[in-house]
Amino acid sequence: MYNHKVVEKKWQKYWLENKTFKTGTDPEKPKYYVLDMFPYPSGKGLHVGHPEGYTATDIMARMKRAQGYNVLHPMGWDAFGLPAEQYALQTGNDPATFTDENIAHFKKQLQALGFSYDWDREIKTTDPNYYKWTQWIFEQMYKMGLAYEAEVPVNWSPDLGTVVANEEVIDGKTERGGYPVYRRKMRQWMLKITAYADRLLDDLDDLDWPEPIKEMQRNWIGRSVGAQVTFKIKDSDKSFAVFTTRPDTLFGCSYTVLAPENELVKEITSPEQKEAVDAYIKSIESKSDLERTDLNKDKTGVFTGAYAINPVNGEEVPVWISDYVLATYGTGAVMAVPAHDERDYAFATKFDLPIKEVVEGGDISKEAFAGDGVHVNSDFLNGLHNEEAKAKMVDWLTEKGVGEKKVNYKMRDWNFSRQRYWGEPIPVIHWEDGETTLVPEDELPLRLPKESNIKPSGTPESPLANLTDWVNVVDENGRKGKRETNTMPQWAGSSWYFLRYIDPHNDKALADPELLKKWMPVDLYIGGAEHATLHLLYARFWHKVLYDLGVVPTKEPFQKLYNQGLILKNHEKMSKSRGNVVNPDDVVDEYGADSLRTYEMFMGPLNASIDWDDNGPSGVKKFLDRVWRTFVNDLDLDPIPSEKITDKNDGKLDKIYNETVKTVTEHFEELRFNTAISQMMVFMNACQKVDKIPREYAEGFVKLMAPVAPHMMEEIWHVFGHDESVQFAAWPTYDASKLVESTVEMAVTVNGKKRGNFQIAKDASREEAQAAATALTHVKEFLEGKEIKKVIVVPNKIVNIVAK
């Protein structure tokens, strides 16, 4: 009887002690770098959703090793971040201790699932020897002018005591914890990701990534070509610029809208409108950018009392403020052409503002017309279609000095400051004379001081501001300074971790350039689609910066990306609050890690979201037990190969075996693990129907199944008499000539009635087929005393006999 508890522990211990999965370094072999998105080690541990992606990468790693590749398959921990700090605040425990305990638990769970990680390369982002290089990268960005300080409107969460990124705000509340968010201006460190916008966009074309992810990044970057136009304020020396993708519609501009935060608002608001404007600004303080720009929300706004001059025709147009205009996007001001823009139309209709048609083709009494058409009411643009009119208007604006062609991006620079304790310290000193300097490179890492009181300060400063011994510094000339007290966001450490795995213990460089050249880019990266516009975009940005510095040899970090789907319970995402979390430890205990791994790969396509079936693992366990009984005789204490295993080959399994090798190999390569496992089940069914199984085929099957169910296959491999791990056995190949049957089954009819079947060599002659048919006992009985008048042979199909 196969005992998964004993066998799995035995092989996990063996693999760990023998470093079976140490990264290969043979210079003659090709490389394969297969990577999981490293997890945040939360207090909850793994749930059954985690192993799905991890099993997929593990299958690829194990197959590629067997195919003769040097494989890099590492694991580490994205260990900074808010949850550990929140826990520390609530319990008074040190976040470092809490994090390390969680890591130990996660690691134990991963090892119990038999993943073939090279644990010698384990990293964690909270290790000073790791974040030394996170800080080093920040310093290079600072020197390149890509890291800068700015007073910017931010999403401030008083409850968390920190700023959160736009991407981390959902419906005016923080993604983690659901706390309210308010907009306020604060001094922040910013990273100039916008400087790389075009490259981040253009280089997507060369990546083997899911198209929806590429599209999400394209939309997030949001490149648009248009014009910047200057509007002067009436009776004032003030002016403002607007960005528009439709400069051709400038003659139809009937009002303008400024972002409520725009500095100009205070200066131009009339005394009569001041109260209404101030009240409106206060009312939108806690709204996130996403909420404010939602196309479906009801339009709100207030007239400032000021007018602007339309540069193209000298008309006076009212200046309004509205929350759908963001200070951080474009210029923080828009020109409104309600006849030809849906949002402007809704706003104009609500506030009874003029709607002027300048492009023919729609019915503006009913809705805005945004399509192509002939320009009207547009002076020198009349009669032109959209594209010609745009070009002509840009030329006119440029010539008159009131505008120019402009490219704009929806993406903003990355807010890189967090007012928290548990993050990488930013290696900067602010001196009393106003100078800002970097901590010298030879003094890195700038370590996070150990501290028990990590309550948020409630100000734009992090809890580090309370640690005066750490904060206050004096240089050799007696000049006083203060360390930067903001820390980096959790995204920092994950923006380059895939590089550190290549050379994790190097204290002289981020990684050896020769090793980077050998291993980059990552060949296969598997993780959740939720990281499309955060981690994946940030990692590409950092990688391009390092490429420009000559640190990395490739423009892109991840050549192929694949998103696994969610594992649901009762058609809902698993979460503690819903009480529907399935713990993998329980499944492993009852059915074994091999059953869990095989079930998760067999459930359905890897990229689909699928409902967990509590009976699934037991069904898979029955299949694995059948594999064991087919190949192993364990009636005595020492298991031996089954009596069915033979060194002879009668050819009965030739076709199905070679078909299985071909299908499994191809489907693994295509990450179609469910259909590959189906094919292995088909082969096992065929094995049940024969008396003998050629040893070569039994061993070939074990090699094919080993990446999915490694513990049982390792055990069977050793029962078959091998000393080395099945991991080092060459991957099976198939014989194409055996993919076709060498024999066929033919039917026999006598006088139109079927009287039997027989096996015969494929493409046998008519004479051979007739002889075989008439030799059948059953047929002989029907032919007795009759004369055969006619025999019709349909090759490989049927023998028709007419007898009287």
Curated annotation (Swiss-Prot):
Keyword Nucleotide-binding among UniProt keywords: yes
GO biological process: leucyl-tRNA aminoacylation
One Pfam family hit: Anticodon_1
Domain of life: Bacteria
Keyword field: Aminoacyl-tRNA synthetase, ATP-binding, Cytoplasm, Ligase, Nucleotide-binding, Protein biosynthesis
Chief localization: cytoplasm
Annotated signal peptide: none
UniProt xrefs under InterPro entries: aa-tRNA-synth_I_CS, aa-tRNA-synth_Ia, Leu-tRNA-ligase, Leu_tRNA-synth_edit, M/V/L/I-tRNA-synth_anticd-bd, Methionyl/Leucyl_tRNA_Synth, Rossmann-like_a/b/a_fold, tRNAsynth_Ia_anticodon-bd
Enzyme Commission no: 6.1.1.4
Residues annotated as binding ATP: 576
GO MF: aminoacyl-tRNA deacylase activity; ATP binding; leucine-tRNA ligase activity
Motif ('KMSKS' region): 573-577
Motif ('HIGH' region): 39-50
Name this protein carries in UniProt: Leucine--tRNA ligase
Organism: Lactobacillus delbrueckii subsp. bulgaricus (strain ATCC 11842 / DSM 20081 / BCRC 10696 / JCM 1002 / NBRC 13953 / NCIMB 11778 / NCTC 12712 / WDCM 00102 / Lb 14)
Recorded name of the encoding gene: leuS
